[in-house]
Amino acid sequence: MNTFTGVILAGGKSSRMGQDKSALVFKGSSFLHHCKRLLIETGASDIIVSANNKAGVPDIYPNCGPLSGIHAALQQTSHSLLIMPVDMPLLTCEQLTPLVTHTQRTTEALYYERFPLPLFLANTEKVRHILSNILEKKDNLSIRSLIAQLEHEKLPVSNSHFFSNVNTMDDYKSIVVD
């Protein structure tokens, strides 16, 4: 297995939730702690939390969404990145491990069909250059936009339940009840 750095995207404003999503509790631990544990169990050599607070790596390009967090993380390590959002608490190692083990040397981005996150991203000059260009132009600041410009591969999704985002209090209540 390749050496990789785990990245947790936790820099969003959580405006629809009304509070910091990374601190929400699910099955006895915070969303942030759950993500860290998953990345460690998947084999991450290091973990970067992309967040604009004391505990995280700040964005170099502020107010540009998750691409800015990914860009900041790429500057912190020479390893490829396994990137996950803080607000997908149903993810397990079963979804993350194939992203690490199925990568080909020519693949720059590996993700699940229909879901741009979690994402395995090569840390190459080409990837950093393309990402910087997107951020400088501030045109189509989506992860899908980045992926479309890279050599990428999609894995099939067997159960989309694991990829559910928690964006609102209703979303949170629905996963806590399950």
Where are these regions (language model features)?
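Conserved donor-nucleotide/metal-binding helix-loop-beta segment in metal-dependent transferases, i.e.
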Residues: C93-P116
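The conserved acidic donor/metal-binding loop of glycosyltransferases
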Residues: P85-P89
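Short beta-strand-to-loop element that shapes/binds the nucleotide-sugar donor at the catalytic cleft/hinge
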Residues: A51, A109-E125
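N-terminal glycine-rich phosphate-binding loop and ensuing alpha1 helix
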Residues: N2-N52, C93-L96
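Alpha-helical elements of Rossmann-like donor-binding domains used by nucleotide-donor carbohydrate transfer enzymes
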Residues: H34, G69-A72, P98, H102, ...
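Short, glycine-/small-residue-rich phosphate/pyrophosphate-handling segment
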Residues: P118-I147
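Short phosphate-binding loop-to-helix
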Residues: N52-I83
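Conserved alpha/beta core of the MobA/IspD/sugar-nucleotide pyrophosphorylase nucleotidyltransferase superfamily
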Residues: N2, K138-D178
